[in-house]
Amino acid sequence: TLRLRLIVIHRTLTMKIQFIGATREVTGSKHLITTDSGHTILLDCGMYQGKGMETDAANRDLGFDPKTLDCIVLSHAHIDHSGLIPYVVKMGFKGDIYCTPATRDLCSLMLTDTAFIQEQDVRMYNKKIDRQHPHKEKGKTYKVEPLYNQNDVNRAMKLFVTYSFDRRFRLFDDVLLTFTNSGHMLGGAVCSLEIYE
């Protein structure tokens, strides 16, 4: 569960909030904030969890261009909140990923494990496709690729910037962030954004 406290200090509000994931289902938490000054902040970057090509397609369709993000704020390390971070890095995200130190440490383990599981699942799926399509049509590709691999995880982990609980810090001139212990899991935080427009 994402716990967010948003404080907006402004007379007229034109900031945009898009609820991209975890709206009609439990997994895939992603919430995009665009401030009046044009900063784009992604709150969590969760993976849809399930089996089959429908889940794969949902994870590949992010609902935003990763190259346009300024930063990611991560509430905790559960994969339905953090699992697509290496994928957005693979797709061009280059900003900072803000979280608590424990969340970063857990993400290092959990995202590595997720990459390994994807590689195993894809290997098995591709073998199944080979058996089902022994006489493939020329020029058609039936194989699938994992969303990301260990190299993508390593690149993503270099973007993590950590702050301890109850320490208020500045994301941008007009945006402050404080992590407060949520009690949800080790390192899990209520993310309090103060946006001065």
Q: Positions of the model-derived regions?
A:
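Short regulatory "switch" loops immediately downstream of catalytic or recognition motifs
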Residues: 1, 121, 184
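Short, Lys/Arg-enriched N-terminal segments with co-localized hydrophobic residues
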Residues: 1-14
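Short acidic-hydrophobic, aromatic-tinged amphipathic segments that line or gate anion-handling sites
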Residues: 158-165
